[in-house]
């Protein structure tokens, strides 16, 4: 268990109304088996994909999600919970089953990315934990992947610790950013916890602490000859910064060491080109340029289109906070429950006055369809008892507009929801996070190659097809006809 998440293992890490509902279910004798879906309705950043992250952290927490004696005492002090219910909570733990997409997978609106099978009270109490962990990490992994793609898959240095929302926000963001494509972090605790390469150069305060910029660079190069990246914009990038960097860099080269420079202000497009010329003319074509300063995927894309000769990108605020979007819109909705009369599982559906908030009823699976070239062509949401097979033509329907449909024969089919926990326990041995996040990151990079570039555009991406099967469409319509 990672240190920064230990406090969240208390089952008090839930919205208060989950507990008031739970007591209501307990009093009504309604703790029967149910199924909940986690899905989302819209990609963040007006994008064409999202990167699923946080499920491994979530499962770690679920495995020890209990009420301590002090937790129960706190609830008793609220004056609304009965002693019998509080006794029930003393033995509470998650004993259900969890299905989910693999971490690092690309995910799309409407499809269930997590499915929970549990007794009603358990399923209700764990809602906040699941959404808290998966929403934030998915947001940051998605943002980072967009930054990484905008850079042309160059090195992305995560510099966000000081701008992140608290310690947990910084730690979760560091983890998710690595899954999304960052190659290193300035967060030293994150580097230790997750086995991510630690990275950092110097601040302006280093330069200002010496009588001259040249002396500051010389001192740094003497201490860190194999990792000298000079911040060249403290005074004047072109008149002094780059010239002093070249003077010190020449000595490093003579000793067999390379060096780089960092730009943190000004017209990055212009300055990076001028700095590149200076470095090349001085005989250092392999000296590298790193830039920072409130970067976003849009800014990076614009700099790339201007021909800015940047080798790596230090991205902080906008990557670890989500920038223009502060949250991911994952929701947790019941899709099936036990019929008290028959004891069998029956589908349920939220219809809503807003058609876009209607849910898909029943226990469902998700299949990803691929063509003969191994390219993803669409995701299909089907009922649990349906099997989508390769080489067979099916008709698939728009999840909101029943008269829109298409037919497709897949060359290969991948089931996306996989059983990860049974009886509240992980299936298989837990993989430590330093190894797990590398598996998740590789899954992200592998899946990116299976999606056409049109889905990955930063602006105006093509919409990837997510459809429902004919049987699910018919079930959904049967509910709608009654209201």
Show where each model-derived region lies.
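Gly/Ser/Thr/Ala-enriched C-terminal appendages of enzymes
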Residues: 2-32, 36, 41, 45-47, ...
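N-terminal, Lys/Arg-enriched amphipathic/low-complexity engagement segments
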Residues: 30, 34-90
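Alpha-helix initiation/capping motif
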Residues: 15, 54, 67-71, 75, ...
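Hydrophobic residues within beta-strands of alpha/beta enzymes
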Residues: 199, 261, 289, 311-313
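Short amphipathic alpha-helical segments
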Residues: 55-57, 139, 436-440
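Buried, small/hydrophobic-residue-enriched core segments of structured protein domains
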Residues: 1-33, 42-44, 80-81, 86-284, ...
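Short hydrophobic "strand-cap" motifs at the C-terminus of beta-strands
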Residues: 292
